[in-house]
Amino acid sequence: MDIKRALILFLLFLVVLSNAFVDYIISNFNHAVTCRKPTYFGIVLQGIFLVILFSIVDYLINENIL
């Protein structure tokens, strides 16, 4: 993994674990957030979002779009 992918993965990790992401995205799913904290289901959703976003970014890097 080159430095570009590693940096983007770290930034995506910060975004997915941010309070804004939890409040606006994860909280839309039933039983994913309790008292503004992700439940186990919410943590799984964060992982799924991270994998999907990284896959998209990786594709864009491989196609020389990013």
From Swiss-Prot:
Name recorded for this polypeptide: Transmembrane protein B66L
Disulfide bonds: none
Record topology, Cytoplasmic segments: 62-66
Organism: African swine fever virus (strain Badajoz 1971 Vero-adapted)
Major place of residence: host cell
Entry's Gene Ontology cellular component terms: host cell membrane; membrane
Family in the record: Belongs to the asfivirus B66L family.
Keywords, comma-separated and alphabetical: Host membrane, Membrane, Signal, Transmembrane, Transmembrane helix
